[in-house]
Amino acid sequence: MRAIVLTLTFLLSFAAFAADDKPPTNAQALELARRWLDAQRAYDEIPGMSAAIVHDQKVLWSGGTGQADPTTNRPATADTLYSICSVSKLFTSVAVMQLRDEGKLTLDDPLSKHLPWYKLPAAEGGREATLVGVLTHSAGLPRESDFPYWTGEFDFPTREKIIERLASQQPLYPSDRYFQYSNLGLTLAGEVVSAKAGKPYDQFVRERILQPLSLTSTYPEVPLDEKGKRLAQGYSAKRRDGTRTPLPLFQTRGIAPAAGFASTVNDLAKFAMWQFRNRDAKSDPVLDPRTLREMYRPHFVDADFETYWGVDFATWKDGGTVFVGHGGSCPGYRTAFQLDPEKKVGVVVMANASGINTGRFAKAIYDIVTPTVKNEATTAPDLSAYTGSYDAFPWDGETIVVAWGDGLATVDAPTMEPMRTLERLRKTGEHEFRRVLKDGSLGETYKFEIGPDGKATRVWVHSNPYPRM
């Protein structure tokens, strides 16, 4: 419909509106986020997605769209398990910082101090890799252990094989000079955790992080016994013909501290709420609040001044807002974990397909919902007769119509920037609305036809009908 309806300008997230128009409620924004996510997933041909958004200590919404396993029609839900891959690194870094706070190590320690078998020489002009170097991906280490585990059957090496092969690997760069994302580095950080804790890495993480935070659906390794049950079936990126291929299930074995975990959006929502709770606390049984703030703070800035990294938290600024978090990408799975610490808003998005950007999905949900998190519910007319999706063929996919304040709003789909396509509609007559321009003036008319059940069957805009889907 966007090619038919003349738009004066793209709207910013919540453009100025006339005094007659009430601001949207949080419930209305959540409904738009849910409808948009469902539509965008379908247009991107992603089998299934799950998402959650939290504000401080409240889960505003969590749910799923599509299918966790299309072969059995098992739906994706907020409790569907996905590989979260590199989000695993956050748990590893928390474990390292717990041991640091106990005086068992320092971030400036060279790896060889705690791992006697670590023999990689320093690159010319650099120093030996340190803990802070691996936790900020600035140690100059290779990206991977020297095995081809990201292709073929995803045959990840055991820790014994990683240690054996490490002896023949070399640093890529001098330490502290370049940002070089390294799964090998975080794998070694996990080995330090095990060495200093005196117990297996997974046991330490369960006892010190997962159990205290009641993360009952988070696993340090993909649980194979959940295949066909709660675990989503992973799919490849799309091929040229638009198809996706189901991928074999894997366990990351020795790479688990860097990429092994599986979780649900509901559990990572708990992880987000703990961080918001921790941030304002004087003490915390899992991690000193001062330490969490230290982890958020950038510890390495790349020479391009575009890449900032905390203690394994990525940190970035978008439109004046500072975000922290991490992404995850394993064969058949993508995850985004994004936090706005100041507003205490967190978004988690998981998908069972490669070749997509879950971070963009998370940011779109954030943009829709965050401006409304403090908006109280107000009495508004029942406009449910008009809400839904209307077919914009052949010019577009569809137009989503939702209640918005005391009127309606439309969003065109597909789009990865739903708030930039949002148009507000004001009721001006029986089943009749007009578009509200940025300056509050009224534009074209939207006339809804009502069927026998009292629901709209189509909407007329610029003398053209668009049927309800």
Set out the residue ranges of the language-model regions:
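Catalytic loop of the DD-peptidase/beta-lactamase superfamily, centered on the K-T-G motif
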Residues: A19-G63, Y149, E153, E164, ...
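A short, polar/charged loop-to-alpha-helix boundary motif
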Residues: A68-T77, N357-A364
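The feature captures the short pre-catalytic strand/loop hairpin that immediately precedes
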Residues: E160-L172, K238-R253
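Bacterial N-terminal signal peptides
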Residues: V5-A15
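Active-site helix/loop module of the DD-peptidase/beta-lactamase fold
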Residues: L32, G48, A78, S83-V87, ...
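Active/ligand-binding-proximal structured segments within catalytic/core domains
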Residues: T92
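Catalytic nucleophile serine of serine hydrolases
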Residues: S86-V87, Q180-N183
